[in-house]
Swiss-Prot record:
GO terms for cellular component: cytoplasm. This is Mini-ribonuclease 3. Keywords: Cytoplasm, Endonuclease, Hydrolase, Magnesium, Nuclease, Ribosome biogenesis, RNA-binding, rRNA processing, rRNA-binding. The gene is mrnC. It comes from Thermoanaerobacter sp. (strain X514). GO terms for biological process: rRNA processing.
Length: 142
């Protein structure tokens, strides 16, 4: 299932690397949120054929801001300088959204993480995207 999802993502029409870098970090995070959510939901459904309420609860463990923030902090040293810059830009971007039920710092790190995923996806760096997604899941499951 995971392999077919990555194949689906790889077949989308993408921007040039320069075009991706010109996007706002919040736009990258917007895309990254969708990519991460689809990845996690696909992974959970492939593992467990359960009622939707159960699937939702399992998904939240991975996609909540606190989990994403912890994940990006733990893998930060494994990122390239360019990837670290994307995370920093996303983390430092001011948003009009007020985080609910999470500290502002965790929310900002989660935004940085999602910006990185959006960047990798739109830049067509699918192997690296898959690597980061897998590392993130490992960190959260520890």
């Amino acid at each position: 299932m995971e392999k077919s999802m990555m194949g689906f993502l790889e077949n989308t029409e993408l921007l040039t690397k320069e075009g991706v870098l010109s996007l706002s970090p919040l736009v990258l995070a917007f895309i990254g949120d969708a990519v991460y959510s689809l990845y996690i939901r696909t992974k959970i459904v492939a593992q467990k054929n359960q009622p939707v309420n159960f699937l939702h609860k399992e998904t939240v463990k991975y996609v909540k801001a606190k989990a994403q923030a912890e994940s990006v902090k733990r893998i930060y040293d494994l990122l390239s300088e360019e990837e670290k810059d994307i995370v920093r830009r996303g983390r430092n971007m001011k948003s009009n959204t007020t985080p609910k039920g999470v500290e502002v710092q965790a929310y900002r790190y989660a935004t940085g993480f999602e910006a990185l995923l959006g960047y990798l996806y739109l830049a067509g760096e699918f192997e690296r995207l898959k690597n980061i997604l897998e590392l993130s899941v490992q960190v959260i499951e520890e």
